[in-house]
Structures are given as C-alpha cells and as structure tokens.
Amino acid sequence: MADRIQVVIALPRDEALPIDVQAVGLRRMAIDLMKEVADVEENTVRYTGGTDNATINFGGEIGLLTTWQHNLLAARFVADGTAKKEVVGPIVHRDTVTRVHSSASVERNPY
C-alpha cells in the first residue's frame, strides 16, 4: 500500500467563480507541491474539498490562518505515492506578495 500525500493550498478568492471551479483548477499546483515530498502517482490525485470559511493550521511560520478574514480560498488534495526518505515533516510555503500559502505532508504507510 502506498503512502498518503496531502496538500492544502490557500490563495486569494475569485468572487466570479464558484469555489469548486476555482479549487479544481489548482490540481497542477497541488501535484507540483506533492512532488516536493514524494513520488506521486498523478492519476490518484483527488480534490477533496474547498472552502472560504475556515481556520487552517499550516504550522511553521504561517501558523493559524483564517480564510474569511483574508478573503482566501482553501483547497485540499490527497494522493497516493512513495514518500521521499529525507522528508520528516510538512513542507510549508508562504508568498506574501501573491498571498499564496501551502502545506504538503505525508502520512507514511507503516507496512
């Protein structure tokens, strides 16, 4: 059984698009983030949900982030893959200019 890779992305919300339409468009960005922590099987990448009304704990330098106060959309993606051996925790990115925040983490298969 493969390791489970999870990515959470928060970025500025586009009011002209429904949440799911905007979030599904982030799939390629999620795959690129997943490749930082694992070898990902791209056909297993799934969008599991998006919201503009949540408090998210990204950890690292970002910490807690409220999407509604910052007018952000948050989307979660999961996939199967093989975690890289050097990854021991989540990888967190923050871009203050574009207001894009992301976190990629791995849940290792114990078997």
UniProtKB/Swiss-Prot annotation:
Pfam families listed in its UniProt record: GP44
Name of this chain's protein: Gene 44.1 protein
Gene assigned in the entry: 44.1
Database matches in InterPro entries: Gp44
